[in-house]
Swiss-Prot record:
Keywords: Fatty acid biosynthesis, Fatty acid metabolism, Flavoprotein, FMN, Lipid biosynthesis, Lipid metabolism, NADP, Oxidoreductase, Oxylipin biosynthesis. Coiled coil: none annotated. Its EC number is 1.3.1.-. It comes from Oryza sativa subsp. japonica. The active site is at residue 188. Gene3D superfamilies: Aldolase class I (3.20.20.70). Belongs to the NADH:flavin oxidoreductase/NADH oxidase family. This is Putative 12-oxophytodienoate reductase 4.
Length: 380
């Protein structure tokens, strides 16, 4: 066993993604992070026992996992069977999942989410309109999904939404999570306030960059006050244009938000999504669009956005990121750190099973490497 451990350590030393890292108060054994991935298998918005297997398959000692996006209230939902953390039933359902991940020695972060206008009346309490920064509907696209016309939040209603995030963070800590990640990305409620294409308000939550970011800053402040900056991270995507949500100056937006994070000493991490990958000589290439934010942020910086093993190793070696979040590759390869250790081929993901409600197919049935393979490092 000692010889195996020495072999693993030697292998990791040559692979930047597999080197240890200290994130705040947490000691990580490698830098491969499970990105938050919506899986639509929490029937009735309650996490189910099959999630124990899904997450523990991807848990390694000293690894970092982020949950699928988890609703903060009954107005936060926009997709079928996504989990929540606003009721005691949901909190109790998360506890055995968190315990199982911890038994594998991994760290577990709960991503807190409100979809805003990315919803339809059928997902809303009493069939009401989804809430947003605006009353403008998302423009229908080729997907065939038509989101309902939203209702613009009144200024006096916003403190209640902030409190929903605060209570959800408290619930996450009660459920045993090591911390929370605020979902401030991909066109959902917080981005609907931040980005000027979706925010047409004339109150203190609209207009200037500072005003548009006020809502998310107040959410951050409330959660930090509730659970401590050392337990709070955030995901941001200033360059992304999902759900009719785009900003005319993404660098200014991202820079302003990072400066707000720096006001909280010990803030756990900033998790950012890359701009679209460039294609150079037939290969996807990182554009390094996140570099200004990396330089500005005082804490742990996580990069996400279509990385493979080679690019992940490069950005760690170059100091462009501290950690790299993997989504589809980790979904299809529950032993992804082990595969990276020996440069093993990866299972191909099946996009058609990403969002089905089956508790096994496309969820917990992706194969592991042969455990008897003599070359396999023991990231398990």
């Amino acid at each position: 066993m000692a010889r195996e451990a020495e072999k693993d350590a030697a292998a990791a030393a040559e692979i930047p993604l597999l080197t240890p890292y200290k994130m705040g108060r947490f000691e990580l054994s490698h830098r491969v992070v499970l990105a938050p991935l919506t899986r639509n298998r929490s029937y009735g918005n309650v996490p189910r026992p099959h999630a124990v297997l899904y997450y523990t398959q991807r848990a390694t000692s000293g690894g970092l996992l982020v949950t699928e996006a988890t609703g903060v209230s009954d107005t936060a939902q926009g997709y079928p069977d996504t989990p929540g953390i606003w009721t005691q039933q949901q909190v109790e359902a998360w506890k055995p999942i968190v315990d199982a991940v911890h038994r594998k020695g991994a760290l577990f972060i709960c991503q807190l989410w409100h979809v805003g206008r990315v919803s339809t009346n059928e997902y809303q309490p009493d069939g009401q309109a989804p809430i947003s920064s605006t009353d403008r509907q998302i423009t229908p696209d080729d997907s065939g999904i038509v989101y309902s016309k939203p209702r613009r939040l009144r200024t006096e209603e916003i403190p209640q939404i902030i409190d929903d995030f605060r209570r959800a963070a408290r619930n996450a800590i009660e459920a045993g999570f090591d911390g929370v990640e605020i979902h401030g990305a991909h066109g959902y409620l917080l981005e609907q306030f931040m980005k000027d294409s979706a925010n047409d308000r004339s109150d203190e939550y609209g207009g200037s960059l500072e005003n548009r970011c006020r809502f998310v800053v107040e959410v951050i402040d409330a959660i930090v006050a509730e659970v401590g900056a050392h337990r709070v991270g955030i995901r941001l995507s200033p360059f992304i244009d999902y759900m009719d949500c785009v900003d005319s100056d993404p660098v200014a937006l991202g820079s302003y938000m990072v400066q707000q994070l720096n006001k909280h000493p010990g803030f756990l991490y900033c998790h950012m999504v890359e701009p679209r990958m460039a294609i150079v000589e037939g290969r996807r290439k990182i554009t390094h669009g996140l570099l200004p934010f990396r330089k500005l942020f005082n804490g742990t910086f996580i990069a996400a956005g279509g990385y493979d093993r080679e690019e992940g190793n490069k950005v760690i070696a170059d100091g462009y990121a501290d950690l790299v979040a993997y989504g589809r590759h980790f979904l299809a390869n529950p032993d992804l750190p082990k595969r990276f250790a020996i440069n093993a081929p990866l299972n191909k993901y099946n996009r058609s099973t990403f969002y089905i409600q089956d508790p096994v197919v496309g969820y917990t049935d992706y194969p592991f490497l042969d455990e008897k393979d003599e070359g396999a490092a023991t990231y398990a």
